[in-house]
């Protein structure tokens, strides 16, 4: 059998076609792993919140947010997780983190056409609890007149966690 130069280039050419498919498959597996981890972290966060361990809930929700972002999860889920992380941060008296998470939830909700009303309500409520009426009014003004009045429909819906006031030893 004679040696053919064409045969020696065919194998590397085939591997160039197969390698991207393998990499895409591995990428899809990694994405699924990240999303499963996010769901597990969300469950841990819910359990911590149900026990009043707001600091642990906040950390678990943050881990879930990070995993959903790595797994390229949808914006609605990310918005939900940020909202819950904001609630947990508020319960842990971490108002800076709570504001960040509520703002992220609002921004992501707008991208996904998911309702941002609960996050707006929580942010306003947090400012009011802190005695920051000016900031609460500014958030209401972001909404506009009709949307701000529509928040009244959520009066009986979830609010921020109620526990010992911040600054009181647990």
Segments and roles (model prediction):
Residues 131-170:
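Terminal, low-structured helical/coil segments at or just beyond the last alpha-helical repeat
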Residues 30, 67-76, 108-113:
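Flexible helix-coil transition and linker loops at the boundaries of alpha-helical arrays
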Residues 39-40, 78-80, 118-120, 138:
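Residue register of alpha-helical TPR repeats
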Residues 63-68, 104-108, 144-146:
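Amphipathic alpha-helical segments of tetratricopeptide repeats
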Residues 36, 73-77, 115, 135:
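Structural signature of alpha-solenoid helical repeat junctions
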């Amino acid at each position: 059998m004679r040696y053919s130069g064409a045969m020696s280039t065919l194998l590397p050419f085939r591997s160039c076609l197969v390698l991207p498919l393998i990499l895409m498959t591995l990428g899809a597996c990694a994405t699924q792993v990240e999303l499963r981890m996010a769901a597990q972290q969300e469950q841990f966060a819910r359990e911590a919140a149900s026990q009043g361990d707001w600091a642990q809930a906040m950390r678990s929700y943050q881990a879930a947010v990070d995993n959903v972002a790595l797994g390229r999860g949808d914006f609605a889920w990310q918005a939900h997780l940020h909202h819950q992380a904001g609630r947990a941060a508020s319960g842990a008296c971490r108002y800076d983190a709570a504001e960040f998470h509520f703002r992220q939830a609002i921004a992501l909700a707008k991208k996904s056409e998911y309702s941002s009303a609960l996050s707006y309500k929580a942010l306003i409520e947090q400012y009011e609890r802190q005695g920051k009426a000016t900031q609460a009014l500014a958030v209401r003004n972001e909404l506009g007149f009709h949307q701000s009045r529509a928040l009244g429909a959520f009066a009986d819906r979830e609010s921020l966690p109620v526990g010992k006031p911040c600054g009181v030893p647990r």
